[in-house]
């Protein structure tokens, strides 16, 4: 039987079920078999792996994963696609499809129920553009024993995730992701590979989980506030952005001056010039200032 992703078979499946794409769900189905196989290769998927897939669509990528993996657990939010998936994937007995929103799913419980715990846990997904960041951060911060993730997303977002300090793309998202994972932008997927065709190209990003966060800080909440505030207005200096974030009262200014001096960071520095380690150091210096005591926790 032809691969699900074969353009002609994809058209037949969509026609048979009278499927209409929902823009609100960011539905774009990949119909390039070569790229699908490259995604599976990027995940280094073998029979030693259990795989969570997000957004299987009509099963094009699911099929390729199922041929390599031990078990596959797919989350599909669109209930119209459930009967389609039961049809297209009925030959793959190692696939379970759940009609659930990944952001609302109790992942530890579901993993324990559907996987035996004896295999590596990997995640592969073609993420809808409109909800890429929430899903990605949800997975990274869930505390799951993820060995490897391979996510397809908008090229611009991928470049921000993979960005280094000093680059225009470097920002709070770069830091949030790189704290938890080593990141690599693997390859670009042209918009012509999808049905319907999106407006922009996509990219495949590989994530390898860190055993420990890249940095540890005394106060994670304060660190998050610091990073968020520092990048709030990219053209402004760290000094201006941090006053806007924490306040312009004299005691706050004094605390900021002391912390910046202790961390050996000039107030005129811009956020994109700081490494993650420097942000961690500055966060700990702020945490030692009495004026920031109320922000601890």
Swiss-Prot record:
Gene Ontology MF annotations: 16S rRNA (adenine(1518)-N(6)/adenine(1519)-N(6))-dimethyltransferase activity; RNA binding
Binding site for S-adenosyl-L-methionine: 28, 30, 55, 76, 101, 126
Top-level EC class as recorded in UniProt: transferase
Cellular compartments annotated: Cytoplasm
Keywords: Cytoplasm, Methyltransferase, RNA-binding, rRNA processing, S-adenosyl-L-methionine, Transferase
Catalysed transformations (reactions): adenosine(1518)/adenosine(1519) in 16S rRNA + 4 S-adenosyl-L-methionine = N(6)-dimethyladenosine(1518)/N(6)-dimethyladenosine(1519) in 16S rRNA + 4 S-adenosyl-L-homocysteine + 4 H(+)
Pfam families registered for this protein in UniProt: RrnaAD
EC numbers on record: 2.1.1.182
Family annotation (Gene3D superfamilies): Ribosomal RNA adenine dimethylase-like, domain 2, Vaccinia Virus protein VP39
GO cellular component: cytosol
CDD domains: AdoMet_MTases (cd02440)
Domain of life: Bacteria
InterPro entries on file: KsgA/Erm (IPR001737), rRNA_Ade_diMease-like_C (IPR023165), rRNA_Ade_Mease_Trfase_CS (IPR020596), rRNA_Ade_methylase_Trfase_N (IPR020598), rRNA_adenine_dimethylase (IPR011530), SAM-dependent_MTases_sf (IPR029063)
Entry function: Specifically dimethylates two adjacent adenosines (A1518 and A1519) in the loop of a conserved hairpin near the 3'-end of 16S rRNA in the 30S particle. May play a critical role in biogenesis of 30S subunits.
The family this protein is said to belong to: Belongs to the class I-like SAM-binding methyltransferase superfamily. rRNA adenine N(6)-methyltransferase family. RsmA subfamily.
Protein name: Ribosomal RNA small subunit methyltransferase A
Taxonomic source organism: Latilactobacillus sakei subsp. sakei (strain 23K) (Lactobacillus sakei subsp. sakei)
Record gene name: rsmA
